Amino acid sequence: MHDERRPQSSSGKRQRLQDTVPIEIPALDEATPPVPPAERPEMIIVTGMSGAGRSRAANALEDLDWYVVDNLPPQLLPALSGMMTTVGAGVHRLAAVVDVRSREFFSHFMDYLRKVRNNGTDVRLIFLDASDAVLVRRFESSRRPHPLQGSGSVLDGIEHERTLLGGLRGVADSVIDTSNYSVHDLARRVRELVAHESDL
């Protein structure tokens, strides 16, 4: 299973960061009425190892009618949740894909997560993982370099990424190991997680 991004039609709900700049988001201290508790918005943050299936998980969420934002810097999470909790925002279920390319912000990630929850948003963190051997095989079969390998090997990049993301994996609400998953297995697992949380 490769972590590839499928093309999006003009009617799709997928938004990449470059598609949303400049982003006009209401300031968090604006005097806007909160969303009633019965309509409390939901946010899913998708992160994890490169090649583990982040984009496939995002596709599954999009198929479940979630609004998906790709490549979101973590510091924008509180502003997005603030937008969601205002009446008339129109977005009540949002999935944000955060990857290691935003690594300079991960040291502050827990603070951003706390602010999102303080804004009145139900937030869940899903971490995608796979074994080193599987990740190496996926990168080699796709003939793409690992984003962190530099002049080293794919395995060097994977080891560096594990060091950067180890803390996030430890605090994730759900960890999905896709080592033995097909694309359909991952989509089914994401559907199960969303359905389970909705029933609680």
Q: Can you say where each PLM-predicted feature lies in the sequence?
A:
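C-terminal accessory "lid"/substrate-recognition subdomains
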Residues: 2-32, 156-200
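Conserved nucleotide-sensing/catalytic segment adjacent to the nucleotide-binding pocket
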Residues: 63-115
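Short glycine-/polar-rich loops that comprise or flank the Walker A/P-loop
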Residues: 64, 90-93, 119-124, 170-173, ...
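Hydrophobic anchor at the beta1->P-loop junction of P-loop NTPases
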Residues: 46
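The conserved Walker
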Residues: 50
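A glycine- and Lys/Arg-enriched "phosphate-lid" helix/loop adjacent to the NTP-binding pocket
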Residues: 120-166, 174, 179
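Conserved glycine(s) of the Walker
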Residues: 53
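Post-Walker A alpha-helix
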Residues: 57-58
